Amino acid sequence: PIYSEGEVLSAWLNEQAAEESLPRALYYNSISLHDGNQLAGRSRMNSLESYPARQQRLFADIAQFISQLEREGRNVMLVVVPEHGAALKGDKLQFAGLREIPSPAIVSVPAAVKFIGPDIKHSELYEVEKTVSYFALSELISNAMKWDAFSGAVNVQRLVDSLPSAAKVAENQDTVMMYIKGQPYIQLDGAEWTKYPDN
């Protein structure tokens, strides 16, 4: 069992501190918010009931990890990308907690990027409001390296202004959801396209 994401991340960071300060990357797949997880020491709850507590704990663990990274004094680009939404609310096509149909609420998730380092001088939050994809994240990472985002001289707005936008499209084995003229449409099992119903 994993009782704390913070403990896992902290242990990794402590291992790195003992080694030479070479560049490194960590890909960490958090499982705190996955369906079916249970909270240790508490009575059994379904995923929707336990989600608020699990979410709060995950954000606290991430905040703790950021504080540790800041104390290290190294240059770090922290990227947090949800796999998908949690379907906390149902709609006319599926119940809360189900993700069989890639609804707009499930596939529209925020991602976060934080630059940490001794020469980082910006602290403002910049929000990208246009629809972007994983390609935009890779572009952001590339630009950060190309323009040396850790020098303290790079305007973060410059990093995000040039990100490519993307059409909102999602697909699984039997279903396709995409936006047409600003409205979500869905195709189930290869049938006719229909507008995704409003709640």
Regions found by a protein language model. Give the residues of each.
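Catalytic-adjacent loop/helix segments of enzymes that bind and process anionic phosphate/sulfate esters
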Residues: 1-71, 88-91, 99-135
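Catalytic metal-binding/acid-base residues of hydrolase active sites
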Residues: 84-85
